[in-house]
UniProtKB/Swiss-Prot annotation:
This is Keratin-associated protein 4-8. The lineage of its organism: Eukaryota, Metazoa, Chordata, Craniata, Vertebrata. In the hair cortex, hair keratin intermediate filaments are embedded in an interfilamentous matrix, consisting of hair keratin-associated proteins (KRTAP), which are essential for the formation of a rigid and resistant hair shaft through their extensive disulfide bond cross-linking with abundant cysteine residues of hair keratins. The matrix proteins include the high-sulfur and high-glycine-tyrosine keratins. Keywords: Keratin, Repeat. One of its GO terms (cellular component) is cytosol. It comes from the Eukaryota.
């Protein structure tokens, strides 16, 4: 298997086998549509070889599926789902239907709870910040979320205050604003 990819005469026989070595890559094993000139397909984790996820018809580039999906010379397949691809975050949880949520990405790490339903917050990634399908940015303090911000100040009406209600201010599902003075309840 190894020898079939090596030598002065290259053959497609054995190309893509996991036994092929880096020095055995040859142009005859390549597909010109998406692979580099010195790689074979389907490939494995050999540096000079094409990654199979880079050779999808919907997102074919010289080096990998989509340029923004590339970290150094390695392609992350989870970046290239359906029609969405993120430049800084490559976790599948960042994709909802066909829409990527860049604001769900903190540095190089994705927080999936940012991408619930149709809401996504840049600063806060806790599920407790969500009421129905609406995120509440005012519920977020630094990296911590205060769920008590997201109560219903008027019974039957969904809203959120910039100040934080304390659980003690709540009767049933309706907080009592008069209970809250400054930051103390």
């Amino acid at each position: 298997m190894v020898n079939s990819c090596c030598g002065s005469v290259c053959s497609d026989q054995g190309c893509g086998q996991d036994l092929c070595q880096e020095t055995c890559c040859c142009p005859s094993c390549c597909q010109t549509t998406c692979c580099r000139t010195t790689c074979y397909r389907p490939s494995y984790s050999v540096s000079c070889c094409c990654r199979p996820q880079c050779c999808q018809s919907v997102c074919c580039q010289p080096t990998c599926c989509r340029p923004s999906c590339c970290v150094s010379s390695c392609c992350k397949p989870q970046c290239c789902q359906s029609v969405c691809c993120q430049p800084t975050c490559c976790h599948p949880s960042c994709c909802i239907s066909s829409c990527c949520r860049p604001s769900c990405c903190v540095s190089s790490c994705c927080k999936p709870q940012c991408c619930q339903s149709v809401c996504c917050q840049p600063n806060c990634c806790r599920p407790s910040c969500s009421i129905s399908s609406c995120c509440r940015p005012s519920c977020c303090e630094s990296s911590c979320c205060r769920p008590c911000c997201c109560l219903r100040p008027v019974c039957g009406r969904v809203s959120c205050h910039t100040t934080c209600y304390r659980p003690a201010c709540v009767i049933s599902t309706c907080p009592r604003p008069v209970c809250c003075a400054s930051s103390c309840c």
